[in-house]
Amino acid sequence: MLLHDVAITSMDVAATSSRLTKVARIAALLHRAAPDTQLVTIIVSWLSGELPQRHIGVGWAALRSLPPPAPQPALTVTGVDATLSKIGTLPGKGSQAQRAALVAELFSAATEAEQTFLLRLLGGELRQGAKGGIMADAVAQAAGLPAATVQRAAMLGGDLAAAAAAGLSGAALDTFTLRVGRPIGPMLAQTATSVHDALERHGGTTIFEAKLDGARVQIHRANDQVRIYTRSLDDVTARLPEVVEATLALPVRDLVADGEAIALCPDNRPQRFQVTASRFGRSVDVAAARATQPLSVFFFDILHRDGTDLLEAPTTERLAALDALVPARHRVDRLITSDPTDAANFLDATLAAGHEGVMAKAPAARYLAGRRGAGWLKVKPVHTLDLVVLAVEWGSGRRRGKLSNIHLGARDPATGGFVMVGKTFKGMTDAMLDWQTTRFHEIAVGPTDGYVVQLRPEQVVEVALDGVQRSSRYPGGLALRFARVVRYRADKDPAEADTIDAVRALY
């Protein structure tokens, strides 16, 4: 199969807002690829916005200057995958020239449509509105299987591509079960507006836990062998010896547990998230980092213990098993209550301890691997800032033809200008996209046909964010975390926008 077929399907999927049409287009492509398991695996990975190789060391810097496109499609899917694998296996810093040469060779053989697809795939910005459930439904349709069967296999196998390859080759998907040493998709939480909202949605009584601002880890132990996986299922065992040691100290033979790794200050308050995140880098000197930035691990769920699977067990049963195994110093603070006042006090105490909020877990909820269920609800304060839009990018997918991704700036009183602190297209409704496309044409500086449109700094926007982190990407040295648009502020002048000092105060 040609890369052209995948690129055109991706374009078609991005161009429609119909879920049924997206599913049908992807299913048709997968049906053509079956029963070739390698081909199916690659296509499902790519159309999910991922690479089978996961990381190949190619970022935006290597994709800035592309050769002219090829006139006719000739690249095959498996050939491109082999090239990406070769790029990813080049060793050391001295391989940058070789990597750049291979990237240039690949793109020179790609048509314009193929270049666009590869550029977005490698840049992590496929944006075709076909992740998660849509991809699973497409696999199910192509394989003639119930969607629930495909979803469960993907959750327990930790990989939709593997489940797709099995299903489309005629293999039984009931072989995908929880297996120690094979990571599964983590359960994710929906959002509650308050502890009172969480109590109501969980029937009046729920289990509140401290929500730590660390790094999610999935811990597997088989006898004296421990493997640690991230939320994205990357193996980081070698980087987290503290987690390995804490796991080996538990009186258990086989274990699958869910937890959080976090760097703490001497007074046990959490370090900034980036301190924890720095321990997960591929080039980190683990021994040196451990000496200066040690990690602690907190277990908050247990999915398997010594031959017994607990995925179908209610939260209360899983937590009882956890408490019987893990000492209190390695568990998160917890409160079971039906009293909104007690819940609010627990949230306040958790925030005062430096944590980011609380999780509410329904007592009877099962562990929904790889799914965002109402059985878990996160409650945390939301920060907002009034910032100025400095530039905007043309959208893709359902946002094609709209000015979408906005560049956000904070006011700098020292210079009278604005300092860029992030970008976002989150939170925008269709009506908002229509409005801002018209508005930004009115305040554009220079041409509007390029990918990025520069603007006069006149439009104030209110954004919600989860916090601020250090970043070398922006001039102010800071970047917003999970910024999303709340509303545009026609009532505010740019001189009333929040300052860069206000942004720093959230760090």
Curated annotation (Swiss-Prot):
Is Ligase one of the keywords? yes
Write down the top EC class of this protein.
Answer: ligase
Recall the GO molecular function terms of this protein's record: ATP binding; DNA binding; DNA ligase (ATP) activity; magnesium ion binding
> InterPro entries under this entry?
ATP-dep_DNA_ligase, DNA_ligae_ATP-dep_bac/arc, DNA_ligase_ATP-dep, DNA_ligase_ATP-dep_C, DNA_ligase_ATP-dep_cent, DNA_ligase_ATP-dep_CS, DNA_ligase_ATP-dep_N, DNA_ligase_N_sf
| Record-level GO cellular component terms | peptidoglycan-based cell wall
Reaction(s) catalysed (UniProt annotation): ATP + (deoxyribonucleotide)n-3'-hydroxyl + 5'-phospho-(deoxyribonucleotide)m = (deoxyribonucleotide)n+m + AMP + diphosphate
Q: Where is this region: Not required for adenylyltransferase activity, required for nick joining?
A: 1-172
Question: What Gene3D superfamilies has UniProt attached to this entry?
Answer: DNA ligase, ATP-dependent, N-terminal domain (1.10.3260.10), DNA ligase/mRNA capping enzyme (3.30.470.30), Nucleic acid-binding proteins (2.40.50.140)
Phenotype of gene-disrupted mutants: Not essential for growth.
Residues recorded as binding ATP, renumbered to this chain, are E209, R216, R231, E260, F300, R372, K378
EC assignment:
6.5.1.1
Task: Name the cystine pairs.
Answer: none
Q: What keywords tag this UniProt record?
A: ATP-binding, Cell cycle, Cell division, DNA damage, DNA recombination, DNA repair, DNA replication, Ligase, Magnesium, Metal-binding, Nucleotide-binding
Q: Which SUPFAM superfamilies match?
A: ATP-dependent DNA ligase DNA-binding domain (SSF117018), DNA ligase/mRNA capping enzyme, catalytic domain (SSF56091), Nucleic acid-binding proteins (SSF50249)
Superkingdom field: Bacteria
Could you confirm whether the keyword Electron transport appears in this record? Answer: no
Q: Which family does it belong to?
A: Belongs to the ATP-dependent DNA ligase family.
Complex formation: Monomer.
- Fetch the PANTHER family from UniProt: DNA LIGASE 1/3 FAMILY MEMBER, DNA LIGASE-RELATED
* Entry function: DNA ligase that seals nicks in double-stranded DNA during DNA replication, DNA recombination and DNA repair.
**Protein name (database record):** DNA ligase B
Q: What is the originating organism of this protein? A: Mycobacterium tuberculosis (strain ATCC 25618 / H37Rv)
What is the organism lineage in this UniProt record? Bacteria, Bacillati, Actinomycetota, Actinomycetes, Mycobacteriales
